[in-house]
Amino acid sequence: MTSVAERLGLPAATPLVIVTADGLGWAHAANIGAERAMSDGAASAAGLMVPAPWARAASARHRGADVGVMLTVNAEHDLYRWGPITHAPSLLDGDGGFPRTAEDVWDHADIDEVRRECRAQVERAILWGFDVTHLSAHLDTLMLRPEFFDVVLELAVDYGLPMRLPTGGSEDSAGFPFRRLALDEGVSIPDVVVSSRTSLRGQLERVVFELGPGVTEIVVRPAIDTAELRAQSTDWADRVDDLDSICDPQFARLLERAGAHQIGWRALRELQRRS
């Protein structure tokens, strides 16, 4: 089988790297962080949380960028909340926002309401002018149960979009072969996904020098340091550190020394649609 690198005109063994700035729309600080990560740093794509409070503002600045939709059915913070953009009572908790945990969604969400909500999030991003390049799932909630995964896979097929799927043993813990199911439907997925709920700074050098053939996605959550960010989230320092790390020229030099070639999700999408 021809490798992705070969289909892009590169040697078969070339490590391909996507650096995705997740959390676009999550907050104003995240919008500016994603913008800087793509313009001044090594990020080649971003992920948009359509229901989040600053998503609409992001559309005015990022319409032409390589932006995917982070399908969102959770609002995990205690004080900073958002909710469905459709009528979806089963996707509300007692505070009137999305449930805080994946387990709450898995236990109580009506699958038809989830299907309508997720499709509406993609359609709204398109309505706002985004050329949607990929799908992912906030907190991976929709990827780790088969009935919810089917919703995302259906969207990926319908819209011709590649998708992020967890790696590193996640299939074993989920109990079903979600990666094979996606590939069987012709959906492109990265071979390795590197992400963390804390700063990736300490891992980046190791990750780069362990790159192998295929597509590796490095997921960061960049944000600028503001008083509002500090009030919104207990992990604000990790987000600021992600921005600093990805904008550090040393990271670009690491990729170059490792022989890696940076791509965006749009490249995977176009290959998928031509298949």
Predicted regions and their residues:
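Active-site beta-loop-alpha junctions enriched in small/polar residues
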Residues: 22-24, 49-53, 70-74, 138-140, ...
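Active-site gating loops and adjacent loop-to-helix segments of metal-dependent hydrolytic enzymes
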Residues: 78-106, 234-237
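A short alpha/beta connector and helix-capping loop motif
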Residues: 28-53
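C-terminal domain-boundary segment and adjacent tail
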Residues: 163-166, 232-275
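Acidic (Asp/Glu)-rich catalytic clusters
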Residues: 7-9, 34-40, 55-66, 83-93, ...
